């Protein structure tokens, strides 16, 4: 965020809950702690609860660990942020007596971003974490819709936009992707990152 803030002569507020999603669970194959967006498909796709935004953290994969606590922290943090703009969550929508076309810009990592989007759109983060990829420096845009006075919902306009890199003829990172075809290595990150503890 610093580069953008310096270039645009703006300041920002750091929101502790908006740090990368810190929830961890225990991988049933290895017994090691694992981030929830890094499970192999065969380990989670047969779990119906993981598709349910209201109950996904109750699944056996997350009964041990901190995923549920961090999910609730994320929801509370997002709702508190939106409350500053007059929005109060009610079920899956927000009540707002005076909705404004303000722009809120959040700089964050993939895991927490998808958790926030899941909360706003009513989608289990497991589906977003394992079905979407947003590379570093990409832009994701959500807008509000108020079709009934005082009832606000969110819609994703774009996810992972990299047009600023294309326009500047800059390459994009493949971080966060897994190999398109099997390679024997479960990552597209540079092999030297393994020794640095990035995996």
Q: Positions of the model-derived regions?
A:
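Acidic, low-complexity terminal tails and accessory targeting/binding regions
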Residues: 21-39, 93-103, 115-199
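Alpha-helical structural signal in soluble globular domains
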Residues: 3-7, 81, 119
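Short glycine/proline- and acidic residue-enriched helix-loop micro-motifs
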Residues: 40-73, 182-186
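Internal catalytic-core helix/loop-beta-alpha segment
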Residues: 60-93
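Phosphate-coordination/substrate-recognition cap region in phosphate-metabolizing enzymes
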Residues: 1-58, 199
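Short, conserved phosphate/pyrophosphate- and ester-handling motifs at nucleotide-, phospho-/glycolipid
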Residues: 109
């Amino acid at each position: 965020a610093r580069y953008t803030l310096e270039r645009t002569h703006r300041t920002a507020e750091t929101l502790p809950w908006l740090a990368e999603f810190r929830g961890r669970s225990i991988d049933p194959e290895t017994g090691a702690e694992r981030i929830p967006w890094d499970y192999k498909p065969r380990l989670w796709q047969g779990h119906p609860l993981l598709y349910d935004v209201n109950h996904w953290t109750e699944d056996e994969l997350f009964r041990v660990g901190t995923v549920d606590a961090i999910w609730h922290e994320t929801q509370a943090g997002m709702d508190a942020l939106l409350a500053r703009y007059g929005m109060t969550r009610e079920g899956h929508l927000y009540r707002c007596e005076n909705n404004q076309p303000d722009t809120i810009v959040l700089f964050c990592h993939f895991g927490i971003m998808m958790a926030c989007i899941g909360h706003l759109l009513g989608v289990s983060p497991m589906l977003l974490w394992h079905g979407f990829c947003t590379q570093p420096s990409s832009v994701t845009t959500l807008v509000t819709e108020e079709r009934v006075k005082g009832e606000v919902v969110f819609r994703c306009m774009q996810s992972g936009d990299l047009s600023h890199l294309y326009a500047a003829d800059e390459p994009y990172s493949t971080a966060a992707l897994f190999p398109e075809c099997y390679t024997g290595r479960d990552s597209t990150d540079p092999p030297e990152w393994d020794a640095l503890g990035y995996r």
